[in-house]
Amino acid sequence: YNLRTEVVNLFANGYVNYTTDYISQVTKMEDERLITTYANADKDLKTGVDLSLKVTPAKWFNFSVGANTYYVTTEGVFEGAHIDNRGWTNNSNLLLNFAPWKGGDIQVQYFVTTPQYYPQLTTSLTHQMNIGIKQRLLKGAMTVSVLLTDVFNTAKWEVWSHNNLFDLKDN
């Protein structure tokens, strides 16, 4: 669904993805090391919704909010161990875009990712802010940009797993 006016653009999309007999990344213990390989998995279901909203209240400023929320469930057996995992996940971002002078842009973007669910592994919630400045020169023939990523140093990514093959907590 898409609703568009001069000031507002709203987009919504729902989806369902069901896969059987597919190749999945799996991890196993071998000589006190974790080894990542690929194996046949039974099924994977992912269903969710994409939403985005862009508002342009002035020529020099716009903002957008985007979110992808979905439920994922994975089922399979690898070397006798279940590699099942399931949960709700959300990836969201907020973008503020300023055009304070001719040919220039300043962007501030904030990302939030809730825990992600993969076969055998779950990741932690992460968030970060990026700030970018861009200037177009020579009538747009050249662009100079600077991007500062993870401004507040908050993008700590943790992974954990508890299954029949190993227990893992990485932080």
Regions found by a protein language model. Give the residues of each.
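Transmembrane beta-barrel strands of outer-membrane/channel proteins
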Residues: 1, 12-18, 65-71, 108-112, ...
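Residues on the lipid-exposed face of transmembrane beta-strands in outer-membrane beta-barrel proteins
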Residues: 1-5, 49-55, 94-98, 131-135, ...
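Outer membrane beta-barrel strand-and-loop segments of large Gram-negative receptors
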Residues: 3-66, 91
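Repeated loop/turn-to-beta-strand initiation elements of outer-membrane beta-barrel proteins
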Residues: 5-10, 59-63, 102-108, 137-144
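Outer-membrane beta-barrel translocator domains and adjoining extracellular loop/strand segments
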Residues: 14, 22-31, 36, 74-83, ...
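Residues that define the transmembrane beta-barrel architecture of outer-membrane proteins
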Residues: 16, 43-47, 84-92, 125-129, ...
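C-terminal beta-barrel architecture of Gram-negative outer-membrane proteins
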Residues: 69-74, 87-137, 160-161, 165
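C-terminal beta-signal and adjacent terminal beta-strands/loops
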Residues: 137-171
